[in-house]
Amino acid sequence: MRKIKSKAFRSAKSMWFYIGLMTLPLLQFFVFYICVNFNSFLLAFRNIVLNSETKQYEFSWTIGNFSNWFTDANEIQLLRQTLKVSLKAYAIMLLIGTPLGLFFAYYIFKKLPGAMFFRFLLFMPSIIASIVLVTIFRYFTDYVVPEILKIAKISLESTLLSGKGTRFATVMFYNLFVSFGTSVLLYSNKMANISPEIVEAAELDGVNAFQEFFFIVIPQTFSTLSVFLVTGVAAIFTNEINNFSFFNYNWKPDTATLGFLMYYRTQKAKAEISQ
């Protein structure tokens, strides 16, 4: 009987400990995720109008925000345009950024000459503030690149960030460079956990670097790679590819994404309300 009571006491005590342990994270999830997003959901159905007589804002419930978005020809055209740019940016990051990140991580994993310096160089953009990097990059594209092209007897009609034909490519080049820090660090750390016996056995069997990378390293790293592949889909709707850092609130149709459109509209609405 005592053993049964003691076991029941320990069970109840463990249950209260578990409840106390889970209360804080569940409360944080409820307040900072469910409540915040529920409020955003309600705001989507609210209409804010300034009363010219009382000079006060009047609020009403409506579905006009959605009906205008999908019936207004200008809004549909804007949505298509920004979605196209977002898909292009996502495709570039997926098809170019991901393979390059894996190759760079493999270079560091094999401890080839300059691997540590290479790792520092790729991770540096994650340490320095974005506005500082953008300022340096703008000076480089505005002044250094034209001088280099002059030596090669190539002239530009405008700077790389000003010309419509070069603006998107220049912005994406910057985004590719600054995206390697976190991904390369995680890829290389995952590769470092690969059993040395597996690599040594493959080398004894005559596997070359190409085969080792694709048939040993990639499968062993796929758990980390899959996380980036899945979460990267959200970037289609949220990534603004540093539009604000480069162009502030100046709208550039060839680089504006869905993420920047949402940010642009939000700031515009705040400005209208504050006025």
Tell what function each PLM region has.
Residues 10-275:
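A structural signal for multi-pass alpha-helical bundles of membrane permease subunits
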